[in-house]
Amino acid sequence: MSKKQNSSISRKKIKRQILEGIAHIHASFNNTIVTITDRQGNTLGWATSGGSGFRGSRKSTPFAAQVAAEKCSEIAKEYGIKNLEIMVKGPGPGRESTIRALNSSGFKITNITDVTPIPHNGCRPPKRRRV
């Protein structure tokens, strides 16, 4: 019995040059997720506060969100992105610091949109917390 050798050549994805991108920021109370996409919505890269080395309650700090945004800006620069449109979702503490970090990374921010989902009397919210 001869063994077949799998020719699984690990090919790196070819980085295409993109001028404009969208930064989706999901800022929850526990974590901040930053995703860079192209204009069609295809994901190019992402970073989170938890993935940046912060655990527990430190994930929900503005500094952790800033570090995640800086990680994401390096990914965007690999693709050659110059202009960013920012979409912010959620009420978390990392909203402002993420936008400031992306701005200071050298991107030209074209517009900032708040896309936080607001129910028009949808589902009943959970009961109030009593501590």
From Swiss-Prot:
GO terms of biological process kind: translation
Stretches of the chain forming a coiled coil according to its record: none
GO CC terms of this entry: ribonucleoprotein complex; ribosome
Keywords, comma-separated and alphabetical: Ribonucleoprotein, Ribosomal protein, RNA-binding, rRNA-binding
InterPro entries (alphabetical): Ribosomal_uS11, Ribosomal_uS11_bac-type, Ribosomal_uS11_CS, Ribosomal_uS11_sf
GO molecular function: rRNA binding; structural constituent of ribosome
Source species, domain of life: Bacteria
A Pfam family reported for this protein in Swiss-Prot or TrEMBL: Ribosomal_S11
Family membership: Belongs to the universal ribosomal protein uS11 family.
Subunit structure: Part of the 30S ribosomal subunit. Interacts with proteins S7 and S18. Binds to IF-3.
Function (record text): Located on the platform of the 30S subunit, it bridges several disparate RNA helices of the 16S rRNA. Forms part of the Shine-Dalgarno cleft in the 70S ribosome.
Record's protein name: Small ribosomal subunit protein uS11
Organism listed in the record: Wigglesworthia glossinidia brevipalpis
Organism lineage: Bacteria, Pseudomonadati, Pseudomonadota, Gammaproteobacteria, Enterobacterales
